[in-house]
Swiss-Prot record:
One of its GO terms (cellular component) is plasma membrane. Pfam families: ATP-synt. InterPro entries: ATP_synth_F1_ATPase_gsu, ATP_synth_F1_gsu, ATP_synth_F1_gsu_CS. Disulfide bonds: none annotated. F-type ATPases have 2 components, CF(1) - the catalytic core - and CF(0) - the membrane proton channel. CF(1) has five subunits: alpha(3), beta(3), gamma(1), delta(1), epsilon(1). CF(0) has three main subunits: a, b and c. Keywords: ATP synthesis, Cell membrane, CF(1), Hydrogen ion transport, Ion transport, Membrane, Transport. One of its GO terms (biological process) is proton motive force-driven plasma membrane ATP synthesis. Its main location: membrane. Belongs to the ATPase gamma chain family. The gene is atpG. Produces ATP from ADP in the presence of a proton gradient across the membrane. The gamma chain is believed to be important in regulating ATPase activity and the flow of protons through the CF(0) complex. It is a peripheral membrane protein. This is ATP synthase gamma chain. It comes from Rhodococcus jostii (strain RHA1).
Length: 326
């Protein structure tokens, strides 16, 4: 058994660590509330742009737009993988990276070459360590993403898609060029509840379109991620100026930016929830370890006291025997 001093030193060390994990748990809890508020604040705009685009598509003479049309022979697919900038969030990053690897395998099986784009330092480190080629990376805002951050990534990805495979566009870092793609996908973590976060794959482009007798709706929109219904309510007819075809071309890139922004907000809430769960588990484990070490320290102290008493009694008996013999 370890000495009492060693046990007390370990107890002190574990208590210090417990203070850190408890503080991280409280911070993550407060950030979840903030992230959920931002998701709710972004929802009205997401709903309205979806409705307006559905009306535009219904009023348009044709749906002939690159962001809506399937490519005849897709060869390259850009995949945006959303990870965190910081660690201590349990399996948050490993789960989304695993989902991304499964998507890469699926794309390769379909004859498409995946081009990896990363949001978050953890994903960047993961692929860099393994020597994987990256189309681009954006870091520093995983916990507090802004619309400008989403728009920055979206602009490059939309340009990449509009160019198509076989054409070149400037690289996001401004150094050289990169070949265009025929599909856009995003892999992120959807916030379900404080205890459940689910890695998800969404195709950003070409956008899926559902055509009915009365109207045209965008399929698998960003409202299907748990923050609203994908069933659009009927809205009053619009008079569009300029022509619906021109407006459709102008708004579709903004729609993709909104979908990416919605995914980033979801991922931020999921990251904080995963970190809260991980830090709570670490704090609970620290409490259990402190209790175990305290019991061991008490047992060691009791054994030490018992030994000291035995030595004193033994010494007293020896002195008494010596005095009696005299």
């Amino acid at each position: 058994m370890a000495s009492i001093l060693e046990l007390r030193s370990r107890i002190k060390s574990v208590n210090s660590t417990k203070k850190i994990t408890k503080a991280q748990e409280l911070i993550a809890t407060s950030r979840i509330t903030k992230a959920q508020s931002r998701v709710a604040a972004a929802k009205p705009y997401a709903e309205e742009i979806t409705k307006v685009l559905s009306e535009l598509a219904s009023a348009s003479a044709s749906l002939d737009h690159p962001l809506l049309n399937e490519r005849t022979d897709p060869k390259r697919a850009a995949v945006l993988v959303v990870t965190s900038d910081r660690g201590m969030c349990g399996g948050y990053n490993s789960n989304v990276l695993k989902e991304a690897e499964e998507l890469f395998q699926l794309l390769r099986s379909e004859g498409k070459d995946p081009v990896i784009y990363v949001l978050g330092s953890k994903g960047l480190g993961y692929y860099t360590f393994r020597g994987r080629d990256l189309g681009g990376a954006w870091t520093g805002f995983s916990q507090d993403p802004g619309y400008s951050d989403a728009a920055k990534a979206s602009r490059h990805l939309v340009d990449l898609f509009m160019a198509g495979s076989g054409s070149e566009v400037p690289a996001p870092n401004g150094e050289g060029t990169i070949e265009g793609v025929d599909e856009l996908h995003i892999v992120y973590t959807r916030f379900v509840s404080m205890l459940t976060q689910s890695p998800e794959v969404r195709r950003m482009a070409p956008l899926e379109v559902m055509v009915s007798e009365e109207r045209v709706e965008l399929g698998e929109d960003m409202l299907s991620n748990g923050h609203g219904s994908s069933d659009s309510e009927p809205v009053a007819g619009y008079n569009f100026e300029p022509e619906p075809d021109k407006l459709l071309g102008a708004l579709l890139p903004k729609y993709i930016s909104t979908r990416i922004y919605s995914s980033l907000l979801d991922a931020a809430a999921s990251e904080s929830a995963a970190r809260r769960t991980a830090m709570k588990a670490a704090t609970d484990n620290a409490n259990e370890l402190v209790n175990t070490l305290s019991r061991q320290a008490n047992q060691a102290r009791q054994a030490q006291i018992t030994q000291e008493i035995s030595e004193i009694v033994g010494g007293a008996n020896a002195l008494a025997s010596s005095a009696g013999s005299d």
